[in-house]
UniProtKB/Swiss-Prot annotation:
Subunit structure: Heterodimer of an alpha and a beta chain.
Transmembrane segments: none
Name of the protein in question: Pyruvate dehydrogenase E1 component subunit beta
Catalytic activity entry: N(6)-[(R)-lipoyl]-L-lysyl-[protein] + pyruvate + H(+) = N(6)-[(R)-S(8)-acetyldihydrolipoyl]-L-lysyl-[protein] + CO2
Gene name per UniProt: pdhB
Amino acid sequence: MAQMTMVQAINDALKTELKNDQDVLIFGEDVGVNGGVFRVTEGLQKEFGEDRVFDTPLAESGIGGLAMGLAVEGFRPVMEVQFLGFVFEVFDAIAGQIARTRFRSGGTKTAPVTIRSPFGGGVHTPELHADNLEGILAQSPGLKVVIPSGPYDAKGLLISSIRSNDPVVYLEHMKLYRSFREEVPEEEYTIDIGKANVKKEGNDISIITYGAMVQESMKAAEELEKDGYSVEVIDLRTVQPIDVDTIVASVEKTGRAVVVQEAQRQAGVGAAVVAELSERAILSLEAPIGRVAAADTIYPFTQAENVWLPNKNDIIEKAKETLEF
């Protein structure tokens, strides 16, 4: 075991798969010589060579096309979209080509592509760098969408993503890159894609969330417990597919739920969770499902995000409203 940041855990996972499988290739803007904008791929080109870890031109559509071609020829590409706000430049390659490969070929071809991309608020980025676009990707058939909330999950989920025979979008919240460390096994391990994690057990209310909002939800749970409430916190880990069985079981136990996301409220992952709970756990609910999300505006940049992003106080307020209904 070693104490790792999320950056270190992701780097370790990439290194593990480069060693294990000669067909794994890593590429994107600045991922080679510089080791990526956040140094996530630092040292990998030096260790594994320019043929396996390499830089591309600043052209997201070209990166996606390259990944598609390599995948159908038997490689396992790990492509990076430098910031998730630029995913629209490569959206056709991802959702229109890579995601459809198995269906389009009648199962004779697969596209084992891992699409890595930093996203998320709290670091005061310029416009288009922090956008939370996981809902759009999750709605694209053929894609799995994974969002780790810490170093341990980051390594295990990335190894699982690279080994998947179907495409996985692996989103890395920038605020979590170096904000804390966790014990991470130095040996390889996997975490099942599509399986949520009960971060904290409780009996009075279920807080269902993912990504950076897991940390905010855990802080909120601590404060709520000081007032005598028993709070369960569930980290989805994967937003496509959603682990419906786990969240339904939790709500059947607690009778109340608050769904938390950093992204805008409209048509997001949170809305999908609420719909599933409404269909499958409605008779267990003792109060309307609470929702915490950002406002339905464009993502603000730099310091403006301080008043836009959801935080633990928003979660506490909504949880108390739900508990006292």
